[in-house]
Curated annotation (Swiss-Prot):
Annotated Gene Ontology cellular component terms: plasma membrane; proton-transporting ATP synthase complex; proton-transporting two-sector ATPase complex, proton-transporting domain
Entry protein name: ATP synthase subunit c
Compartment annotation: Cell membrane
Annotated gene: atpE
Family that this chain belongs to: Belongs to the ATPase C chain family.
Site positions (Reversibly protonated during proton transport): D61
Transmembrane regions: 11-31, 53-73
Topology within the bilayer: Multi-pass membrane protein
Summary of the function given for this chain in its UniProt record: F(1)F(0) ATP synthase produces ATP from ADP in the presence of a proton or sodium gradient. F-type ATPases consist of two structural domains, F(1) containing the extramembraneous catalytic core and F(0) containing the membrane proton channel, linked together by a central stalk and a peripheral stalk. During catalysis, ATP synthesis in the catalytic domain of F(1) is coupled via a rotary mechanism of the central stalk subunits to proton translocation.
Any one Pfam family match given in the protein's UniProt record, by short name: ATP-synt_C
Length: 79
């Protein structure tokens, strides 16, 4: 029975990390497309848009890193 619980933990961690990566990829893709759209409409605002783009991209990318950290903690500390 213990082996089944450990196997399910491995699957849960893999799903958590995978879904976090997929979500971040979709979010960064949408963010990049909106940045390019805004830069094409208002070329004089590119420096302001670029700063906001990188700040928000860092925030979007931080969530999967937290999920990876939690997943690895669950994988190595709990099992």
């Amino acid at each position: 029975m213990e082996s089944l619980n450990v196997d399910m933990l491995y699957i849960a961690v893999a799903i958590m990390i995978g879904l976090a990566a997929i979500g971040a990829a979709i979010g960064i893709g949408i963010l990049g497309s909106k940045f390019l759209e805004g830069a094409a409409r208002q070329p004089d605002l590119v420096p302001l848009l670029r700063t906001q783009f990188f700040v928000v991209m860092g925030l979007v990318d931080a969530i999967p890193m937290i999920a990876v950290g939690l997943g690895l903690y669950m994988l190595f500390a709990i099992s």
